[in-house]
Amino acid sequence: MLSSLAPYMANPRQTLTQVLNFALVLSTAFMLWKGLSVVTNSTSPIVVVLSGSMEPAFQRGDLLFLWNRSPRVDVGEIVVYNVRGKDIPIVHRVMRSFPELPGREDKKSVKKGGEEGEETSSTPSQKLLTKGDNNMADDTELYAQGQEYLDRKEDIVGSVRGYVPGVGYVTILLSEHPWLRSVLLGFMGLMVVLQRE
């Protein structure tokens, strides 16, 4: 086994260069993702549709591009939101909007320095009710327990501004079959290391 590594050990400078090139590719991809997050003001500027709840507008596996710089969301707009306590993005259409009155205080339970208390905020936040185009009822059953609507500032990841059909199936396959992710990453690493200049 060690004899197969001999060509790489004979020229450690070239091997180190290849490993650093692979690390550079990974760090560049990470920086591009973070840069896109800053530009779009979204924690996930690109998401994949995971279910058929938005058919016929979007199919399972479609890749969506999000934008979260608008201060308000209009009724009929398609948004991506996260349910509190869960890390699964949901793509649905806004059915109703409930604007907060300016000056009304929102009370939020916060924990600072180990002590629990209430924090009040007088900035208005838009409240939204969503529904999948292919669903019979609105999303109140999907929201966190006791939550009747989505908060624009806290729950919305972004509004859909564009999409590419079917490209996200790769992501779905990688999440449904974790071993495939390891094989793909190992193959990419092997290709970089074995590449000769």
Swiss-Prot record:
Q: Which residues lie on this side of the membrane: Cytoplasmic?
A: 1-14
Q: Where in the cell is it found?
A: Endoplasmic reticulum membrane
Q: Name one GO cellular component term.
A: signal peptidase complex
What SUPFAM superfamilies does its record include?
Answer: LexA/Signal peptidase
Q: Which parts of the chain does the record assign to the membrane side Lumenal?
A: 34-197
Identify the catalytic residues.
Answer: S53 (charge relay system), H92 (charge relay system), D139 (charge relay system)
Query: Per the record, which residues fall in region Disordered?
Result: 102-134
Keywords (A to Z) from UniProt: Endoplasmic reticulum, Glycoprotein, Hydrolase, Membrane, Protease, Signal-anchor, Transmembrane, Transmembrane helix
Per the UniProt entry, the Enzyme Commission number(s) are: 3.4.21.89
* Basic and acidic residues bias: start-end ranges: 102-115
Indicate which residues are glycosylated according to the record. Answer: N41
A GO MF label: serine-type endopeptidase activity
Reaction(s) catalysed (UniProt annotation): Cleavage of hydrophobic, N-terminal signal or leader sequences from secreted and periplasmic proteins
Regions that span the bilayer = 15-33
Q: A biological process (GO) annotation for this entry?
A: signal peptide processing
Q: How does it sit in the membrane?
A: Single-pass type II membrane protein
> Its family?
Belongs to the peptidase S26B family.
**What does this gene product do?**
Catalytic component of the signal peptidase complex (SPC) which catalyzes the cleavage of N-terminal signal sequences from nascent proteins as they are translocated into the lumen of the endoplasmic reticulum. Specifically cleaves N-terminal signal peptides that contain a hydrophobic alpha-helix (h-region) shorter than 18-20 amino acids.
What UniProt notes about the protein's domains is: The C-terminal short (CTS) helix is essential for catalytic activity. It may be accommodated as a transmembrane helix in the thinned membrane environment of the complex, similarly to the signal peptide in the complex substrates.
Q: Describe the subunit structure.
A: Component of the signal peptidase complex (SPC) composed of a catalytic subunit SEC11 and three accessory subunits SPC1, SPC2 and SPC3. The complex induces a local thinning of the ER membrane which is used to measure the length of the signal peptide (SP) h-region of protein substrates. This ensures the selectivity of the complex towards h-regions shorter than 18-20 amino acids. SPC associates with the translocon complex.
Could you tell me what this protein is called?
A: Signal peptidase complex catalytic subunit SEC11
